[in-house]
Regions:
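Single conserved hydrophobic/aromatic residue that forms the stacking wall/gate
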Residues: 1-7, 12
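Short, well-ordered beta-strand elements
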Residues: 8-9, 32, 81, 128-130, ...
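A structural "hinge/loop" feature
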Residues: 18-22, 90-103, 218, 227-232, ...
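Surface-exposed binding/hinge segments that line
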Residues: 25-108
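Gly/Pro-rich hinge or "lid" segments in bacterial periplasmic/extracellular proteins
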Residues: 68, 78-79, 84-161, 172, ...
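Extracellular/periplasmic solute-recognition and catalytic clefts
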Residues: 133-148, 163-232, 260, 264-269
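Ligand/substrate-recognition segments at binding pockets and active sites
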Residues: 176, 308-415, 551-554, 558-565
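Detector for C-terminal structural segments
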Residues: 252-299, 354, 358-368, 398-567
Length: 567
């Protein structure tokens, strides 16, 4: 890439091949133009990632114009594609690893019509390290190495077969590992055979890295729906709503959630801490000089009050659970709430999918912890066990803020590009996509938004977003916004994905890694190497230490290179 503040040029290489390995055509710049047009015309699920980034694209997607030539993506020649952006985006290059920006050959697209991109190997063209050989639903996926791939020397595994696993037989993975069918097997600490597996592989059970997913508890500050509730009177509803609007009350809950106990319900006690996360933006997501993002957030957080002193925001440990702090904050909140006529106990409805046993156990763990810390004469957690459809409809798939039928919910967010804004902007008070989880509408609830300070949060985001030349200053400003979010406790960070146990013959840290895009996901096998014997803890830990050191240097180098080529 030759990047600048409002545009970038990308040079092309490689050729298209069919599933049989036959050459189809060269990859050309026009294929990238066709790719965006195809995604736009077919309402691609990730369109929001680029819709307001590329000049003219939003007008095309929303129907203001049907002339795609007005969109800021052009083929300058056969091998150079140019993107014109609507605004400066220092993180633009990291967006290009998302499939929404991948190329599509127009001739092939027309030949396949509605069959394009279906689940048959011949429905797409290939120019990556592998060709899809077979896809059998709920059975297996098979890949073979693409011999024509430009970087084929770095692809050491000739064939890949993925077996379908629905989680019902947790002993199956280790059986297939021992028989040689699997190169990697998940190990489940809560399964019936874990003790036996641990005894046999005590030196070989290793834990995956935490990923980019951030899970958290969040409050609904403007609840309108009460179809699933334990509350029996309007007074109880009003008391809960007033309590949730009180920052001391929210902070009390934040300090009272035992995240380790919650995680243990699905990950087991031994692995419970390995998936914990204390920030919305992963603490090592970006570097600010010689400090991690999380370290800078910590320095900002203490400015909000002494209760935040000594808080460790690193991953894989609970930075918040503190019974004494929780009770002190609750005492402050109770005085303030009683002066407003609030009656106790405060009833908090928390929905959960009743078919997800781990989730039910987790919510019951939260109930037990909070009622123990505060006493059930002060707070009662009412776990609402709902059908899968009902749970989706009151939470993740709720059509509007007013349909969110809960007081407290467990939700999550995944970053799309290498900038803190990907985690923080969705909650801005003007047009944030996920403002709705608080039960808020940007236009209808301005007064409530201001009373919560979300207008201040939005101002912090704007100030950070306006800094496009000095990356360190930009990230530091976003750290201020993250600190505000922690102090406000509308969102209470809890855990990530990853941190899971396995036995494996995959040589540690030989596969690609990225917190954004598809290049670092679990289905990228370029660079990966296998070894004869299972990986040991010692081997894994030594490789991890070396990788972390090299990763930090690579991030610093990348940020310096960005600063040097801004036009």
């Amino acid at each position: 890439f030759a990047s600048c503040l409002v545009g970038s040029e990308m040079c092309i290489r490689d050729r298209w091949y069919t599933a049989d390995g036959e050459e189809y055509a060269p990859v050309k710049a026009q294929d990238f133009v066709t790719g965006i047009k195809y995604a736009s015309d077919n309402k691609g699920q990730a369109m929001d990632l680029i819709q307001n980034s590329i000049k003219g694209l939003n007008d095309y997607v929303t129907g203001v114009t049907n002339d795609f030539s007005t969109v800021g993506v052009k083929a300058l020649d056969d091998y150079t594609v140019e993107y014109t952006l609507t605004r400066p985006e220092p993180y633009w290059n990291s967006k290009t690893t998302n499939s929404i920006l991948f190329p599509v050959n127009e001739e092939f697209l027309k030949s396949k019509e509605k069959e394009f991109g279906t689940l048959t190997p011949s429905s797409i063209l290939y120019n990556g390290p592998y060709l899809l050989k077979d896809f059998t639903s709920k059975s297996s996926i098979e890949y073979v190495k693409n011999p024509h791939y430009y970087d084929h020397d770095k692809v050491t595994i000739e064939k890949v077969k993925l077996a379908y696993f629905d989680g019902s037989d947790q002993e199956m993975t280790i059986r297939n590992f021992e028989s040689g069918a699997y190169s990697l097997a998940g190990v489940y600490p809560n399964s019936s055979n874990y003790a036996k597996t641990k005894e046999k592989y005590q030196d070989n059970i290793v834990y995956s890295l935490q990923d980019k997913t951030s899970w958290y508890f969040n409050f609904n500050v403007n609840r309108k729906a009460y179809n699933h509730t334990a509350k029996t009177t309007d007074e109880q509803k009003k008391s809960t709503q007033i309590a949730i609007l009180n920052k001391n009350f929210r902070q009390a809950i934040n300090f009272a959630i035992d995240r380790t106990a919650y995680s243990a319900q699905s990950n087991g006690q031994e692995a419970a801490s390995k998936t914990l996360r204390n920030t919305l933006v992963p603490p090592t997501f970006v570097q600010v000089g010689d400090k991690s993002f999380g370290e800078v957030v910590s320095s900002k957080l203490v400015q909000y009050g002494t209760e935040w002193s000594g808080i460790n925001l690193a991953d894989a440990q609970d930075g918040y659970f503190n019974k004494e702090k929780a009770q002190a904050k609750f005492a402050e909140a109770k005085k303030e709430l009683e002066s407003k006529g609030v009656t106790f106990p405060i009833h908090i409805d928390v929905p959960v999918d009743q078919t997800n046993k781990n989730a039910v156990s987790g919510m019951n763990s939260v109930k037990q912890t909070l009622e123990t810390v505060f006493g059930d004469d002060n707070i009662v957690i009412d776990v609402q066990q709902l059908s899968t459809d009902d749970f989706s409809n009151v939470a993740f798939l709720a059509p509007n803020p007013a349909s969110r039928d809960y007081d407290l919910n467990f939700d999550g967010w995944v970053g799309d590009y290498q900038d803190p804004s990907t985690y923080l902007d969705p909650f801005n008070a003007e047009d944030g996509f996920y403002l709705k989880i608080f039960g808020l509408d940007a236009k209808e609830n301005q007064e409530l938004i201001k009373s919560l300070g979300l207008d201040t949060y939005t101002k912090l985001l704007k100030e950070a977003g306006a800094e496009n030349k000095d990356v360190a200053k930009r990230y530091e400003k976003y750290a201020e916004a993250q600190a505000w979010m922690i102090d406000n406790s509308l969102i209470m960070s809890t855990m990530s994905n990853g941190g899971t146990a396995s036995v494996t013959k995959v040589t540690p840290f030989t596969r690609a890694y990225s917190l954004v895009g598809i290049k670092g996901d679990g289905n990228n096998y370029k660079y990966m190497r296998l070894q004869k014997d299972p990986v040991t803890k010692k081997q894994f830990d030594e490789a991890k230490a070396k990788w972390e050191e090299e990763s930090k240097k690579a991030i610093e180098k990348s940020q310096k290179e960005f600063e040097s080529h801004i036009k």
